[in-house]
Amino acid sequence: MDIDQYMTDLGRRARHASRAMARASTAAKNAALDAVARAIERDAQALKDANARDVARAREKGLDAAFIDRLTLSDNALKTMVEGLRQVASLADPIGEIGNLKYRPSGIRVGQMRVPLGVIGIIYESRPNVTIDAAALCLKSGNATILRGGSEALESNAALAKLIGEGLEAAGLPQDAVQVVATADRAAVGKLITMTDYVDVIVPRGGKSLIERLINEARVPMIKHLDGICHVYVDDRADLAKALTVCDNAKTHRYGTCNTMETLLVASGIAATLLPPLGKLYRDKQVELRVDAAARAVLAEAGVGPLVDATDEDWHTEYLAPVLAIKVVDGLDAAIEHINHYGSHHTDAIVTEDHDRAMRFLREVDSASVMVNASTRFADGFEFGLGAEIGISNDKLHARGPVGLEGLTSLKYVVLGHGEGRQ
């Protein structure tokens, strides 16, 4: 297979399909989503059979249990796919909305219309559910998409792509609006991220090594985040019960997500009160604690252990594991300075009853999501009321934070006049 020619052909067809998608009605897009949902329900066994072959090959390669779990299409996973499709269909269609409409002294009205981005390339690892999630969001937002999933999920993705194509055709929409790259050749990714004539934006969903490669090689703009080094700062004017709840949930609700707390900052004025009960809570949940000297002194006196001395590397680390770095800081200024220096601009929270300090934290912490008296785990499209998300961005241009339907659109200016000319 000539990868260069193959990818160029996918891009050309996607660009052509994107024009039809931009003018597609809400009814047609929702009909396509419903048709795909019904096709998954109808062909559930065939999907599981294709997936079983992918899983068998993954086991032969000796891939670990966590990888196999992400790859597997269980009955529950298929049910979640169907529910997700119908949920996206129920969301308001942002395309064509005109907002910020203002009268100008010249007599014209100026506003902004929400429009699709065009062609979106999605690069992700071997999680077949992302094929449906990404296709649904791109379809509803009026975009065409080229999906490049992990090589271990080739048969699963091909089977899903067939059903997506059927759904698009049934709704009178172009099948090329959703195309799945049908090769495991890594050169396909290299081509996709440089096809500026055909692809408007890349959304990578994967590990750090994938994102770093794309940062170095991509010519197409990206919506991405590299790390989720999230902080909770407990102020000396915090409510202790709230602090315990937030710190527990932010770390132990799920360890392997990008919005999990990785560093806990504690004001020196509350450290002796907060750290003993919190340290015992983490110890009981088998969370390894990597602590600075001040935190060690308080925790050791309270009989909490074992403790590991933190190094500078710990403040830079996204563990994605039951490991937590803890530092005692002088106060709000030191906490903000630490977060802006070591953080990844993803999600950070303060626990405090002081309104002025909370507002300062919101203004001065340079992150995509900033929270007061709430767990960092809330940094999620569903929790934010977006309905669904295609990922989270910690960049500052275009989309920032959880990226839902609106994040896959752009704004263009529209002018409504009555024959006016500029004087």
UniProtKB/Swiss-Prot annotation:
Its EC number is 1.2.1.41. InterPro entries: Ald_DH/histidinol_DH, Ald_DH_C, Ald_DH_N, Aldehyde_DH_dom, G-glutamylP_reductase_CS, Glu-5-SA_DH, GPR_dom. It catalyses: L-glutamate 5-semialdehyde + phosphate + NADP(+) = L-glutamyl 5-phosphate + NADPH + H(+). It is found in: Cytoplasm. Pathway: Amino-acid biosynthesis; L-proline biosynthesis; L-glutamate 5-semialdehyde from L-glutamate: step 2/2. Keywords: Amino-acid biosynthesis, Cytoplasm, NADP, Oxidoreductase, Proline biosynthesis. GO terms for molecular function: glutamate-5-semialdehyde dehydrogenase activity; NADP binding. CDD domains: ALDH_F18-19_ProA-GPR (cd07079). One of its GO terms (cellular component) is cytoplasm. The keyword NADP applies. GO terms for biological process: L-proline biosynthetic process. Catalyzes the NADPH-dependent reduction of L-glutamate 5-phosphate into L-glutamate 5-semialdehyde and phosphate. The product spontaneously undergoes cyclization to form 1-pyrroline-5-carboxylate. Belongs to the gamma-glutamyl phosphate reductase family. NCBIfam families: PRK00197.1 (NF001221), proA (TIGR00407). This is Gamma-glutamyl phosphate reductase. It comes from Burkholderia ambifaria (strain MC40-6). The lineage of its organism: Bacteria, Pseudomonadati, Pseudomonadota, Betaproteobacteria, Burkholderiales.
